[in-house]
From Swiss-Prot:
Cofactor detail note: Binds 2 magnesium ions per tetramer.
Record's protein name: Phenylalanine--tRNA ligase alpha subunit
The encoding gene: pheS
Catalytic activity line of the entry: tRNA(Phe) + L-phenylalanine + ATP = L-phenylalanyl-tRNA(Phe) + AMP + diphosphate + H(+)
Family listed: Belongs to the class-II aminoacyl-tRNA synthetase family. Phe-tRNA synthetase alpha subunit type 1 subfamily.
Alphabetical UniProt keywords: Aminoacyl-tRNA synthetase, ATP-binding, Cytoplasm, Ligase, Magnesium, Metal-binding, Nucleotide-binding, Protein biosynthesis
InterPro entries reported for this sequence: aa-tRNA-synth_II (IPR006195), aa-tRNA-synth_II/BPL/LPL (IPR045864), Phe-tRNA-synth_IIc_asu (IPR004529), Phe-tRNA_ligase_II_N (IPR004188), Phe_tRNA_ligase_alpha1_bac (IPR022911), Phenylalanyl-tRNA_Synthase (IPR002319), tRNA-bd_arm (IPR010978)
Amino acid sequence: MDDLKAKYLGQIAEAADEAAIEAIRLAAVGKKGEIALMMRELGKMTPEERQTAGPALNALKDEINSALAAKKAALADAALDERLRSEWLDVTLPARNRRQGTLHPISQAREELTAIFAEMGFSVAEGPRIDTDWYNFDALNIPGHHPARAEMDTFYMHRAEGDNRPPHVLRTHTSPVQIRSMEKMGAPLRVICPGGVYRADYDQTHTPMFHQVEGLALDRDISMANLKWTLEEFVKAFFEVDDVELRFRASHFPFTEPSAEVDIRCSWEGGQLKIGEGDDWLEILGSGMVHPKVIAAGGIDPDVYQGFAFGIGIDRLAMLKYGIPDLRAFFDSDLRWLRHYGFAALDMPNLHGGLSR
């Protein structure tokens, strides 16, 4: 039996492939193998001989099976190593192209506005988008019968029956932030208030939600001349022109007196807007001297301090500067549109390096 063991273990050690291993298995431990034939002879032996030969044959069979399995695993590992040495995989293929995000034109316009007015000493203030009707209307000298307070123009928040809290609205302008700024900071004061506002209107040039920036300057002896200079410098910087002509038209806003709508001289030759030249006029904002009642509502003595205010539609200015024809496209969430009109997110505007590059 020792000779049989040495014979098959030697063959297993010299086997070069799985076919040779299988042939050895069949010859040694297969149904017709040499060890199987020897186990059939156990029945012809005496009980004493079987007690000795049986365990010895089983041990030999187990040892040969273990040697076969180990050799088979070794051959498989060797084959894998050879395949890894011979095969070549290109791992330098380019990665999937990932598009960079861009800054929305409204966000860009807001950053440009902020940069310009910051150079003039204005700080930025923000306020709640849901506000009481006192801040949105009463404090701004807008009487109860004014059309702007009608439900067809203003979004009122629902109040349950018996709710005694003051009515709340989605703010129709950012002017309420002026009142809150006066209450918080007092005078003198120079502040701009950019943000989203809401009105019940929807067409090519109006949306239920849009963006405004309000400006407020309070000090002793402020006049319309200060307002005119501020707006001229702003328009020149925003549209990046050396000279601009503004036209102030008398108007009426409850929160300013006197009030003026401001037009800029422009040209539409060839369908392209050119600021500061031509014979056309384009309305861009409303302005005026702050009404004494509004100053008083902010907790400041109107006999001591005067000021000017202005309101600018950020969306409208973005349309004019960037050549965007339809206001509604701002809110369509179209990535193709945003890739075309968007701006580099990290290219922050400033007056020295340029606003929109």
